[in-house]
From Swiss-Prot:
Its main location: mitochondrion. Optimum pH is 8.0-8.2 for the propionyl-CoA carboxylase activity as measured with the holoenzyme. The keyword Transcription does not apply. This is Propionyl-CoA carboxylase beta chain, mitochondrial. It is found in: Mitochondrion matrix. PROSITE patterns: COA_CT_CTER, COA_CT_NTER. It comes from Sus scrofa (Pig).
Length: 539
């Protein structure tokens, strides 16, 4: 319901923007007399982009223009544009002609606010040379990225570009490299978000890949290094744009994109909501908002949520929703590597990162894709001071030749590395299974977890009872009795609790209250690491 209200309000704002742009176009003077009039004419030309015909064409595709997108993303009246008068510098192939000069070139850049918080933004304008990147276009983007780094504010890129501007040759390629360099320099310093709202091909794809989060719009956005025609000529594969690089491909198969939205308005509204979870920079604490959900709220339904039979599945997402503030959970990559859950929520108003195994998918086993998905998310949270809460129900790593040949050892080590390296507050709740090496990996006490809880249903052991009995009691006459003995000794939380590997065995209903209390205590946590140039994560 709330999302529908936001979309309705956004569409109303959009109508106002379109009317104001059209009014500006009607007032356009073609015979400048003074410098002031010339300035105003240039300004109006910049607002018009590639012209009304191209704007109409953009709308017919179900897409907004670059300026309409900025207007919906930012708070009303907060956008301050920079470099509106910049034009490309190419003189070859007829580009020097006045008809090929557009104030602002093919990107709109500047700063504004989202819910009162500073953000820098660039929005590529497909109505001008298909949004292609020129040297001037890249210069504008680099300038706002430099400014964002200087003041400590996030950068959001609204991508809608045909790629490099061929007429400019190597200058266009140099422009991409300039942007990539800044993406890398800003990584872990300020949040970087890419929203793909049209084509993004060739060299253009690497900037979104270097940012922290990449979102897409269904049916109108595409990400690929080489398009369908090149694929056909090289590999003889017949593939459509949507199949090769559409939103479904990248949110369910490749893992390149983190979420996909129905249309431009839906994407921009969700991006505003997502932005609220993030700090402005690595020097700022995670945002805290007023909370009306009691921090000591008990959740009685959690006492019976885990089935008595250890082989029966349940939905870890239900547990997450019931514990976080007001059941508000922004899941990241919900359709990729579904055996692990990651996303943002709030606990007593404080932003937290959630990681959880999903027993409904592959019994919650860790595999290559889920390990990489989890590791990337954990490292983002650690870089930006966001506490981590981990819900564990993991029977181990997924066995099989496909996983071994694919490098599960190396990829699984990424998740282990991420949790071990993280110095933010780390709270872990073992809901049921925590077997073998996967137990260690999932933010265990041994990886410097700050607070580690177990529910009464927790089973912390090297492996499940059946497999263990087959090894320990091989040839034993009474296998059932042996299995019962193993369960009594190991398939429960007590062995770990006795050794201090879990801090407490808690009633599930008290989980929210315990976590909120722990977060208050851990808010002042500080960890000093030995100096090093950079770590060498097993990429």
């Amino acid at each position: 319901m709330a999302a529908a209200v936001r979309v309705t309000a956004a569409r109303a704002r959009l109508r106002v923007v379109v009317r104001s742009l059209h009014a500006g176009v009607r007032s356009l003077c073609t015979q400048p007399v003074s410098v002031n009039e010339r300035i105003e004419n240039k300004r109006q030309a910049a607002l018009l982009g590639g012209g009304q015909r191209r704007i109409d064409s953009q709308h017919k595709r179900g897409k907004l223009t670059a300026r309409e997108r900025i207007s919906l993303l930012l708070d009303p009246g907060s956008f301050i544009e920079s470099d509106m008068f910049v034009e490309h510098r190419c003189a070859d192939f007829g580009m020097a002609a006045d008809k090929n000069k557009f104030p602002g070139d093919s990107v709109v850049t500047g700063r504004g606010r989202i819910n009162g918080r500073l953000v820098y933004v660039f929005s590529q304008d497909f109505t001008v040379f298909g949004g292609s990147l020129s040297g001037a276009h890249a210069q504008k983007i680099c300038k706002i990225m430099d400014q964002a780094m200087t003041v400590g504010a996030p950068v959001i890129g609204l991508n809608d570009s045909g790629g490099a501007r061929i007429q400019e040759g190597v200058e266009s390629l140099a422009g991409y490299a300039d942007i990539f360099l800044r993406n890398v320099s800003a990584s872990g310093v300020i949040p970087q978000i890419s929203l793909i709202m049209g084509p993004c091909a060739g060299g253009a794809v690497y900037s979104p890949a270097l940012t922290d989060f990449t979102f897409m719009v269904k049916d109108t956005s595409y990400l690929f290094i080489t398009g369908p025609d090149v694929v056909k000529s090289v590999t003889n594969e017949d593939v459509t744009q949507e199949e090769l690089g559409g939103a479904r491909t990248h949110t369910t198969m490749s893992g390149v994109a983190h979420r996909a939205f129905d249309n431009d308005v839906d994407a921009l509204c969700n991006l505003r909501e997502f932005f609220n979870y993030l700090p402005l920079s690595n020097q700022d604490p995670a945002p805290i908002r007023e909370c009306h959900d009691p921090s000591d709220r008990l959740v009685p339904e959690l006492d019976t949520v885990v089935p008595l039979e250890s082989t029966r599945a349940y939905d870890m997402v239900d547990i997450i929703y019931s514990i976080v503030d007001e059941r508000d959970f922004f899941e990241i990559m919900p359709n990729y590597a579904k055996n692990i859950i990651v996303g943002f929520a709030r606990m007593n108003g404080r932003t937290v990162g959630i990681v959880g195994n999903q027993p409904k998918v592959a019994s919650g086993c860790l595999d290559i894709n889920s390990s990489v998905k989890g590791a990337r998310f954990v490292r983002f949270c650690d870089a930006f001071n966001i506490p981590l809460i981990t819900f564990v129900d993991v029977p181990g790593f997924l066995p099989g030749t496909a996983q071994e040949y694919g490098g599960i050892i190396r990829h699984g080590a990424k998740l282990l590395y991420a949790f071990a390296e993280a110095t933010v507050p780390k709270i872990t709740v073992i809901t049921r299974k925590a077997y073998g090496g996967a137990y260690d990996v999932m933010s265990s006490k041994h990886l410097c977890g700050d607070t580690n809880y177990a529910w009464p249903t927790a089973e912390i052991a090297v492996m499940g009872a059946k497999g263990a009995v087959e090894i320990i009691f091989k040839g034993h006459e009474n296998v059932e009795a042996a299995q019962a003995e193993y369960i009594e000794k190991f398939a429960n939380p007590f062995p770990a609790a006795v050794r201090g590997f879990v801090d407490d065995i808690i009633q599930p209903s008290s989980t929210r209250a315990r976590i909120c209390c722990d977060l208050d205590v851990l808010a002042s946590k500080k960890v000093q690491r030995p100096w090093r140039k950079h770590a060498n994560i097993p990429l």
